[in-house]
């Protein structure tokens, strides 16, 4: 009876080892990229159209809430991340600079940054923007800015 169980047990042991090696991340180099966590944060290209739309909205809200005489706009997107929820959350870390355009001017995209040292101002801001594109809804959930 011991001999009749030997072969099936050996095959079972080989199967267990093969499965362990197949699913273990430490079992050697993986050739495929790990699947993303559903609802997890992912880095995104700051130049994507939807990221730029979220950035423009965050800039607009920043300027509305600022007591500064001048508009500010993004100098650099340091990091852009996205999370798919019941819409899309964007987490943007942005270096913002003061422009030469006063708040009475409307075309912010063409405003140059101040080059006079006493008028230059840079802020490092973290924005959390929530967008529901199919409802045409966007809101700024969090904004935290520090002098850079």
From Swiss-Prot:
SS bonds (residue pairs): 101-111, 125-145
GO molecular function: cysteine-type endopeptidase inhibitor activity
Residues carrying the site annotation Reactive site: 39
Residue ranges that the Swiss-Prot or TrEMBL entry lists as coiled coil: none
Keyword Membrane attached: no
Compartmental location: Secreted
InterPro entries xrefs: Cystatin_dom (IPR000010), Cystatin_sf (IPR046350)
Record keywords: Disulfide bond, Protease inhibitor, Secreted, Signal, Thiol protease inhibitor
Domain of life per record: Eukaryota
Signal peptide positions (record): 1-28
Predominant cellular place of this UniProt entry's protein: secreted
Pfam family, one: Cystatin
Sequence motif Secondary area of contact, residues: 83-87
Record SMART domains: CY (SM00043)
GO cellular component entries: cytoplasm; extracellular space; vesicle
Family as reported in the entry's similarity comment: Belongs to the cystatin family.
Described purpose of this protein according to its UniProt entry: This is a thiol proteinase inhibitor.
The protein's name: Cystatin-C
């Amino acid at each position: 009876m011991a001999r009749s169980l030997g072969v099936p047990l050996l095959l079972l042991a080989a199967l267990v080892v093969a499965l362990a090696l197949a699913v273990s991340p430490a079992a050697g180099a993986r050739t495929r990229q790990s699947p993303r966590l559903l609802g997890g944060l992912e880095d995104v290209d700051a130049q994507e159209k939807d990221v730029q739309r979220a950035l423009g909205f965050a800039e607009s809200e920043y300027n509305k809430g600022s007591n500064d005489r001048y508009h500010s706009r993004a100098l650099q997107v340091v990091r852009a991340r996205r999370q798919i929820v019941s819409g899309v959350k964007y987490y943007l870390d942005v270096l913002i600079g003061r422009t030469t355009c006063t708040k009475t001017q409307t075309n912010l995209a063409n405003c140059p940054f101040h080059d006079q040292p006493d008028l230059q101002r840079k802020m490092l801001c973290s924005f959390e923007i929530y967008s529901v594109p199919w409802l045409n809804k966007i809101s700024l959930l969090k904004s935290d800015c520090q002098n850079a």
